[in-house]
């Protein structure tokens, strides 16, 4: 595999499928991914399943690279793709042992380096990286210019646009945008630093806060904008980093987790109706339990560690989810959250139209 110097926070991911979507998820910026599944690369890489164009993680650590790829949609092999995206990789490691180390000791600052690197070079590399906490990575990966996303899910026809959604790009996954288009949304993707005033000039029916990398607390520009948008009577839906930023805008706090949640098999309970969904997860920060206030309802909790997975305003107009309802990869159990967002926009439009009469 392509091997060049890469340093980042080493985490482990327990998903058995979807390595392409994981590798190209911008939420993994400045991270190295240790895959617990023993063989990676067996389906190659295709253009349709990318979650970003630029690539996401800094590097991958695997047990075994598949010698063959079998997939009728394949455009490329994994090793060539990593080189194309400048993502480092290392194979033939005991990933089970490495995962146990990370589980017991937490995520670690780690590096992949060429064999000829000296101890002095390695020490200098580690001195150059002090972790993800306190870093605003959303600003780095966000689009520089606004654009309209029109692509629906694979082999789905585009529906007539019924709702206009402004989607904040903090590192947005493509499948999130596809699912919004599938539901009849005209999606305008805007840079992370877009002000609330500029957003409202677009006359949106709803605001979407995307996933993304890094620590949410330094993103003061986004928190400030979200606070202003909450005061306006408009539906808001956040995922992953967007969930955390919404929490901060609602005067909650966030904290770094020991090793985070990274996988496609995480059970989450809906506190309101007691249903359980298996979800895709990818986050290293969480909303602090101690910071909860009376203005926020906790809607979902992880059944692994009871951490907060979903929050909502009392009227349900503003809500968010920590995991990834869009999956990609993973189960689709909780994609109904997108439908809830659509219903919120529909209700708000009906109310607004009634007031005009």
Model-derived regions: residue spans:
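Cysteine-nucleophile active-site neighborhood
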Residues: 205-206, 210-281, 286, 330-348
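Active-site-proximal beta-strand elements of phosphoester/diester hydrolases
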Residues: 164-168, 279-280, 319-323
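Catalytic beta-strand/loop cores that center a nucleophilic Ser/Cys/Thr
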Residues: 275-316, 354
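A short, acidic, flexible beta-alpha connecting loop/helix-capping segment that sits on the rim
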Residues: 315, 325-329
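Proline-centered loop/turn at the N-terminus of a beta-strand
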Residues: 88, 164, 235-237, 253, ...
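RNA-binding accessory domains that recognize and position tRNA/RNA substrates
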Residues: 3-197, 201-202, 216, 328, ...
């Amino acid at each position: 595999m392509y091997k060049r110097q890469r340093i980042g926070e080493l985490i482990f991911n327990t998903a058995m499928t979807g390595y392409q979507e994981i590798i190209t998820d911008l939420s993994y910026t400045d991270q190295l991914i240790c895959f617990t599944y023993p063989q990676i690369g067996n389906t190659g890489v295709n253009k349709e399943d990318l979650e970003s164009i630029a690539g996401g993680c800094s590097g991958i650590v695997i047990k075994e690279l598949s010698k063959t790829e079998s997939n009728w949609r394949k455009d490329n092999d994994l090793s060539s793709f990593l080189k194309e995206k400048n993502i480092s990789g290392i194979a033939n490691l005991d990933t089970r042992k490495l995962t146990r180390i990370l589980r017991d000791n937490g995520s670690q600052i780690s590096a992949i380096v060429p064999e000829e690197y000296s101890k002095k070079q390695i020490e200098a590399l580690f001195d150059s990286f002090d972790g993800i906490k306190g870093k605003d990575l959303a600003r780095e990966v966000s689009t520089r210019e606004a654009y309209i996303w029109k692509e629906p899910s694979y082999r789905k026809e585009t529906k007539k646009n019924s709702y206009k959604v402004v989607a904040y790009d903090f590192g947005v996954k493509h499948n999130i945008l596809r699912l919004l288009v599938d539901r009849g949304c005209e999606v305008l993707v805007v840079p992370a630093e877009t002000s609330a005033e500029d957003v409202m000039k677009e006359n949106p029916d709803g605001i979407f806060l995307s996933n993304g990398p890094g620590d949410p607390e330094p993103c003061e520009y986004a928190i400030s904008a979200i606070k202003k948008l909450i005061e306006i009577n408009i539906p808001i839906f956040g995922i992953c980093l967007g969930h955390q930023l919404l929490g901060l805008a609602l005067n909650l706090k966030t904290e770094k987790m020991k090793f985070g949640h990274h996988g496609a098999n995480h059970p989450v309970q809906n506190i309101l109706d007691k249903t359980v969904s298996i979800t895709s997860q990818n986050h290293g920060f969480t909303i602090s339990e101690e910071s909860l206030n009376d203005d926020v309802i906790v809607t979902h909790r992880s059944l692994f560690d009871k951490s907060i997975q979903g929050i909502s305003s009392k009227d349900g107009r503003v809500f968010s989810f920590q995991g990834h309802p869009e999956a990609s990869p993973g189960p689709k159990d909780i994609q109904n959250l997108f439908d809830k967002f659509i219903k919120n926009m529909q209700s708000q439009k009906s109310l607004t139209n009634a007031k005009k009469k």
